[in-house]
């Protein structure tokens, strides 16, 4: 896992300034850990209207992105990035993007992301060029740009040196298959609500157990499906039982 080069084929390259100019991803760009290059299919059209879409065969509403501009943009991206780059189409028909999937993508040296628009892109382009399809959820967006940015952000967090603290990525939600524990900062008391005493104790073993217990309890209450695919250790089972007992007694 090292530096990452991401090429994005998109009709709206300006949107990706959110990645290159703000936050952790911007810092990764400045550090040379992340490179983001956009390729606009409109730049590969030959008509005066720069047409990139057409009516779907068989009728129906909406328009479909044409093959040729996409294919020509992909050729340019491949030449710049390297033929080995994995081509990913952000699509509601794709597999759901999980933290485990993000870890796998972070192992790549280069990615080419296809951000579709309208009713989608010509299926023949997908069959000929796309290696993987990924979805960020079971809902409809106006295009693939936001999912592409989500993927870039998630992968960037796993690049060595991208985060301010070496342990930050390891402690994120989903990293070990669980939701994150609650976090607190100063002041110790706000509107009669106190920070849990254990976090002020300085006892790192107790703090670790408390955080694990809260993480397990939160996951059980909010995303029990995550626990179904995870084998709990003896300590984790005991902590979850403690959490549920304390919850029921309160």
Curated annotation (Swiss-Prot):
NCBIfam families: PRK00026.1, trmD. Keywords: Cytoplasm, Methyltransferase, S-adenosyl-L-methionine, Transferase, tRNA processing. The keyword S-adenosyl-L-methionine applies. CDD domains: TrmD-like. It comes from Pseudomonas putida (strain GB-1). Belongs to the RNA methyltransferase TrmD family. S-adenosyl-L-methionine binds at residues 116, 136-141. The gene is trmD. Homodimer. Its EC number is 2.1.1.228. It is found in: Cytoplasm. One of its GO terms (cellular component) is cytosol. It catalyses: guanosine(37) in tRNA + S-adenosyl-L-methionine = N(1)-methylguanosine(37) in tRNA + S-adenosyl-L-homocysteine + H(+). This is tRNA (guanine-N(1)-)-methyltransferase. Specifically methylates guanosine-37 in various tRNAs.
């Amino acid at each position: 896992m090292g530096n990452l080069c991401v090429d994005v084929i998109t009709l709206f390259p300006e949107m990706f300034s959110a990645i290159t100019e703000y936050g952790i991803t911007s810092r990764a760009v400045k550090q040379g850990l992340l490179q983001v290059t956009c390729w606009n299919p409109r730049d590969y059209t030959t008509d005066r209207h720069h047409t990139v879409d057409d009516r779907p065969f068989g009728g129906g509403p909406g328009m479909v992105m044409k093959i040729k501009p996409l294919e020509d943009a992909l050729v340019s991206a491949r030449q710049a990035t390297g033929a080995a780059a994995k081509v990913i189409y952000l699509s509601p028909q794709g597999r759901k993007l999980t933290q485990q999937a993000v870890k796998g993508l972070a192992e790549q040296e280069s990615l080419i992301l296809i951000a579709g628009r309208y009713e989608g892109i010509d299926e023949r382009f997908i069959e000929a060029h796309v290696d993987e399809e990924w979805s960020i959820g079971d809902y409809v967006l106006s295009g693939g740009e936001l999912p592409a940015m989500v993927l870039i952000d998630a992968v960037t967090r796993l690049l060595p040196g991208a985060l301010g603290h070496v342990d930050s990525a390891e402690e994120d939600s989903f990293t070990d298959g669980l939701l994150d524990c609650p976090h607190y900062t100063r002041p110790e008391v706000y509107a009669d609500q106190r920070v849990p005493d254990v976090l002020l104790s300085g006892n790192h073993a107790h703090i670790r157990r408390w955080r694990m217990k809260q993480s397990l309890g939160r996951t059980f209450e909010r995303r029990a499906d995550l626990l179904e695919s995870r084998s709990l250790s003896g300590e984790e089972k005991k902590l979850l039982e403690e959490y549920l007992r304390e919850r029921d007694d309160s």
